[in-house]
């Protein structure tokens, strides 16, 4: 095939949240987890992160009402001293995610060190195309 290339820049989000929370001068008080990522990967990886760093994580979609609901839920958690994972996007996201898609990801990609702009390199937390 001529004149064909692919830019693969897939990453795992929970390790990035951990890196942000460990960074000096961090002032992040809550996270909105991207619904499109969680629709594939699920929410099951987030509770240990929320507990370890005592930070609310709310899964949300990208529609204005979805975002506002995610922000509202994060604020309620902050006001009540909670630090849990909430799924504000249940019409798309489940705890386990899309297991068929996860199987394809495991088949097609392999873990790689990935640089995140503003964070640095996170070891073995990105994906690249696996050798054929």
Residue ranges with predicted function:
Residues 1-5:
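A short alpha->loop->secondary-structure connector
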Residues 7, 11-14, 18-22:
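Active-site loop-to-helix "anion-binding N-cap" substructures in soluble metabolic enzymes
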Residues 7-9, 26-95:
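A conserved active-site cap/scaffold subdomain adjacent to cofactor or substrate pockets
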Residues 16, 27, 45-48, 100, ...:
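Exposed alpha-helical structural elements
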Residues 69-132:
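Internal helical hairpin/lid segments
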């Amino acid at each position: 095939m001529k004149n064909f290339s692919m830019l693969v820049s897939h990453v795992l989000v929970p390790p990035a949240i951990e890196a942000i929370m460990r960074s000096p001068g961090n002032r992040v008080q809550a996270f909105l987890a991207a619904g499109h990522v969680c629709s594939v990967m699920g929410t099951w990886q987030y509770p240990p992160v929320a507990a370890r760093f005592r930070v609310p994580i709310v899964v949300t979609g990208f529609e204005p009402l979805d975002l506002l609901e995610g922000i509202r839920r994060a604020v309620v958690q902050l006001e009540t001293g909670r630090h849990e994972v909430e799924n504000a996007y249940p019409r798309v996201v489940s705890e386990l995610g899309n297991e068929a898609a996860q199987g394809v990801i495991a088949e097609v990609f392999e873990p790689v060190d990935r640089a995140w702009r503003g964070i640095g390199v996170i070891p073995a937390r990105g994906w690249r195309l696996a050798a054929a």
